[in-house]
């Protein structure tokens, strides 16, 4: 049996190649009603553009029906229909290939090249938590999620700034944001000397306030970059301060001195330079103008400033019924935490917030609610927060609480099987190679595999894409994809779990189907846990 991981991308690529030269034609089906009869479709209109009268030659139909290749899913049939060319896979064979190698489908499809480095800069973390606005909190969560996605993809990531405020460190721990703490401050002596050289003729001998070195003209540099670069045309001059130079010194230090254990390809190289590194500044739209100044100042004062600097701009955060600026990030966390505690008290009775066993669970649920709210919208778009209690309900299908609830349901299922096995009701789990995957024929089972497990490696890879070659200053990322994926996976699992009884009666003739269903849900659990790890969320065993 072939052992290479099957892939949606590989299958689509082979299907399109089989039709000959031209653009992509095939699409993957996702809706339940379509998946009842087909898995891929070449729409009739697309075929008309490729072939006379939309008729696919017989030899191509034969080639599609016999399609093979690395990572290509085995084909059962391919036939013309009114909608176009419909193709269905050998589902039992696909189930077997995928569920016999579950761990392989919880890793990115295409790891990054060895030695790729990204420096993520989140200026909001230089403030104290009580001054952290909701729009700044969004940048912190986006940067943390992006760092996790890049590292899972094999990219070497360095995070700046190192946090100095102990209260900020505590708050980040509450949010389950993995960010480094500061050990010592980088020296800005060299930068200060360069700045004074540039400023000598600009200050006209005037006395300056403490901490201010003078003004530096940036207009010429903006014009050199050109309008297409994306810099604000109103950028004229920059007030150079000791604090600003300290920020640049830390960035420069981080860029030039990477930890030796940060990536195997960089081992032993303490001064790796700036050439192969991408710097991404993750800032709110309110901070963009100031960050552009810092970017240009870095280029002005340092000969070997990074050539590849990109700005990831996060849109504003609006709170329904109230100005978002009135609520700080810690207040937002406390608000959600209080809601979670109240909801659990109503469900279970008593004041569980005082129970140490529930303290961690409430913290995870609060953070899950916040992260799914903040990260389910594309970071470049404006975000609207609804503070109603429905946002933390396990009944609502869009919330982080709903995802964590289904994570706990999976844990309960496998714990129930384990307990029943220890009691002698069920046998031990047999080798996967002995399972009969033809027993998986419920449409909900194929939906879970085809829409969630099989495409998950490609999703992980797309989450970590940084298009550093695109022209202009700004960069876009798809950090919303993981949250949306986990919500849809939870909805599909919940629908299946509510309808299908997994742990049946302890009768030998029912064990085969039970075990193959458990193996499918093992894969669902693996994918779900991996997705939650990309958000810094641990799986819960109960809620």
UniProtKB/Swiss-Prot annotation:
Keywords: Disease variant, Epilepsy. It comes from the Eukaryota. InterPro entries: DALR_anticod-bd (IPR008909), DALRD3 (IPR037380), tRNAsynth_Ia_anticodon-bd (IPR009080). One of its GO terms (biological process) is tRNA C3-cytosine methylation. GO terms for molecular function: arginine-tRNA ligase activity; ATP binding; tRNA binding. Pfam families: DALR_1. Part of a complex containing tRNA(Arg), METTL2A or METTL2B. Interacts with tRNA(Arg)(CCU) and tRNA(Arg)(UCU). Interacts with METTL2A and METTL2B. It is linked to Developmental and epileptic encephalopathy 86: A form of epileptic encephalopathy, a heterogeneous group of severe early-onset epilepsies characterized by refractory seizures, neurodevelopmental impairment, and poor prognosis. Development is normal prior to seizure onset, after which cognitive and motor delays become apparent. DEE86 inheritance is autosomal recessive. Involved in tRNA methylation. Facilitates the recognition and targeting of tRNA(Arg)(CCU) and tRNA(Arg)(UCU) substrates for N(3)-methylcytidine modification by METTL2A and METTL2B. This is DALR anticodon-binding domain-containing protein 3. It comes from Homo sapiens (Human). The gene is DALRD3.
């Amino acid at each position: 049996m072939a052992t290479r991981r099957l892939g949606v991308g590989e299958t689509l690529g082979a299907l399109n190649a089989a039709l000959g030269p031209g653009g992509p034609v095939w699409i993957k089906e996702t809706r339940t009603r379509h998946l009842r009869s087909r898995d891929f479709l070449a729409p009739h209109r697309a075929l008309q553009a490729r072939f006379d009268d939309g008729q696919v030659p017989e030899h191509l139909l034969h080639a599609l029906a016999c399609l093979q290749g690395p990572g290509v899913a085995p084909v059962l049939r391919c036939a013309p229909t009114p909608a176009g060319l419909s193709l269905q896979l050998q589902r039992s064979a696909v189930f077997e290939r995928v569920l016999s190698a579950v761990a392989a489908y919880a890793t990115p499809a295409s790891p990054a090249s060895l030695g790729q480095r990204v420096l993520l800069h989140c200026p909001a973390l230089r403030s104290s938590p009580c001054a952290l606005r909701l729009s700044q909190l969004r940048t912190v969560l986006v940067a943390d999620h992006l760092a996790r996605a890049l590292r899972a993809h094999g990219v070497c990531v360095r995070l700046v700034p190192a946090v100095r405020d102990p209260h900020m460190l505590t708050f980040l721990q509450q949010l389950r944001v993995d960010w480094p703490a500061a050990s010592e401050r980088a020296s800005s002596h060299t930068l200060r000397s360069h700045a004074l050289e540039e400023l000598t003729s600009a200050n006209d001998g005037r006395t300056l306030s403490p901490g201010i070195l003078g003004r530096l003209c940036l207009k010429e540099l903006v014009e050199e970059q050109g309008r297409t670069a994306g810099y604000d045309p109103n950028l004229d001059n920059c007030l150079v301060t000791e604090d600003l130079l300290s920020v640049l010194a830390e960035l420069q230090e981080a860029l030039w001195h990477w930890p030796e254990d940060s990536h195997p390809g960089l081992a032993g190289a303490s001064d790796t330079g700036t050439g192969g590194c991408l710097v991404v500044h993750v800032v709110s739209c309110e901070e963009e103008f100031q960050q552009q100044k810092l970017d240009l100042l870095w280029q002005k004062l340092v000969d070997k400033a990074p050539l590849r600097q990109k700005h990831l701009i996060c849109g504003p955060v609006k709170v329904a019924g109230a100005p978002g600026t009135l609520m700080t990030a810690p207040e937002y966390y406390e608000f959600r935490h209080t809601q979670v505690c109240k909801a659990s008290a109503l469900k279970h009775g008593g004041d569980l917030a005082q129970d140490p066993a529930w303290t961690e669970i409430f913290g995870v649920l609060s953070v899950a609610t916040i992260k799914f709210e903040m990260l389910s919208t594309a970071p470049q778009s404006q975000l609207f927060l609804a503070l109603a209690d429905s946002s933390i309900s396990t009944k609502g299908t869009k919330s982080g609480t709903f995802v964590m609830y289904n994570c706990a349901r999976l844990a309960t299922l496998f714990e129930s099987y384990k307990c029943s096995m220890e009691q002698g009701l069920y046998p031990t789990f047999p080798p996967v190679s002995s399972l009969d995957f033809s027993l998986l024929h419920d449409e909900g089972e194929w939906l879970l595999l085809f829409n969630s497990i099989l495409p998950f490696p490609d999703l992980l890879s797309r989450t970590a894409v940084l298009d550093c070659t695109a022209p202009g200053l700004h960069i876009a990322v798809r950090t919303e994809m993981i949250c949306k994926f986990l919500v849809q996976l939870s909805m599909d699992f919940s629908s299946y779990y509510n309808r299908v009884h997994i742990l049946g009666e302890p009768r030998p003739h029912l064990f085969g189907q039970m075990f193959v269903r458990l193996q499918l849900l093992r894969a669902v659990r693996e994918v779900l846990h991996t997705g939650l790890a990309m958000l810094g969320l641990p799986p819960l065993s109960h809620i």
